């Protein structure tokens, strides 16, 4: 039996912030001979994405409870029980040596199922504030890791696993030294875009004129509107795209990024070594604010809460950053990144599987 490959079940779903770090760890362990399966839900992004990476996926039926009506909350215990039972049956068949919870609703019943079967549970919290599921699962987990300090008081800070093409970018001092001309501003609202960025940045461009050149990811369905907004203020030269398929190339092009501060975005920007203006999504947990704070504290970024993200404030900030200042900020961003996060998470999974 000792010669058989170890088996891992990754539990992650819902958003790229959960799924992509899970894929990074899965590929790292598969390269070492591990067998990996995935636990997810059939109606979220993991259903299409994970099989494209050559990983088999099993589905359970579960969704979030926040913001649901009374009827849904009353039905929640039965739904969670059924999801737990489904996850338990899947794990009995696959017999994983360890399960890795990377977040999303699927981790709750999945983690409980593993624990009830005596399978070690390893958790990774991507955000600066722990989600409800991970807060609860941490009580039964064998190991808890966190990307940013503060989500859990005693958990090891290991960073977020980041795509290898971002990690492979030249260091800031190689990439940015010697650049001249307009400051290159990359505007990224995520795959869904961000209305506040789409509305504000064309006006910022009008104020800054030919001192900046902008590459603006508008999100689905917004490209024409944003192009019209730039043209309407006499700035039609800036590039607007719905999506950016090659984010590593976009980071390599940029001098500074203006974006939301989802956990994976913040970690990628740090790994790339880029200054940033972060506009946290407004949420009662202020999760994105806490994600961005370590980079602001390091002198690598500026946070604008959404009400403070005005044309004047952003234009003044960008105008006040010289190329020398941007290079210093880029080096600070890179210095606080944890480029071996994938290896750290994979190493802990391996350690737990051996014990």
Curated annotation (Swiss-Prot):
One of its GO terms (biological process) is lipid glycosylation. Pathway: Cell wall biogenesis; peptidoglycan biosynthesis. It comes from the Bacteria. It catalyses: di-trans,octa-cis-undecaprenyl diphospho-N-acetyl-alpha-D-muramoyl-L-alanyl-D-glutamyl-meso-2,6-diaminopimeloyl-D-alanyl-D-alanine + UDP-N-acetyl-alpha-D-glucosamine = di-trans,octa-cis-undecaprenyl diphospho-[N-acetyl-alpha-D-glucosaminyl-(1->4)]-N-acetyl-alpha-D-muramoyl-L-alanyl-D-glutamyl-meso-2,6-diaminopimeloyl-D-alanyl-D-alanine + UDP + H(+). InterPro entries: GlcNAc_MurG, Glyco_trans_28_C, GlycoTrans_28_N. Keywords: Cell cycle, Cell division, Cell inner membrane, Cell membrane, Cell shape, Cell wall biogenesis/degradation, Glycosyltransferase, Membrane, Peptidoglycan synthesis, Transferase. Its EC number is 2.4.1.227. It is an enzyme of class 2 (transferase). One of its GO terms (cellular component) is plasma membrane. UDP-N-acetyl-alpha-D-glucosamine binds at residues 15-17, 127, 163, 191, 244, 263-268, 288. It is a peripheral membrane protein. It is found in: Cell inner membrane. One of its GO terms (molecular function) is undecaprenyldiphospho-muramoylpentapeptide beta-N-acetylglucosaminyltransferase activity. Cell wall formation. Catalyzes the transfer of a GlcNAc subunit on undecaprenyl-pyrophosphoryl-MurNAc-pentapeptide (lipid intermediate I) to form undecaprenyl-pyrophosphoryl-MurNAc-(pentapeptide)GlcNAc (lipid intermediate II). Belongs to the glycosyltransferase 28 family. MurG subfamily. This is UDP-N-acetylglucosamine--N-acetylmuramyl-(pentapeptide) pyrophosphoryl-undecaprenol N-acetylglucosamine transferase. It comes from Salmonella choleraesuis (strain SC-B67). The gene is murG.
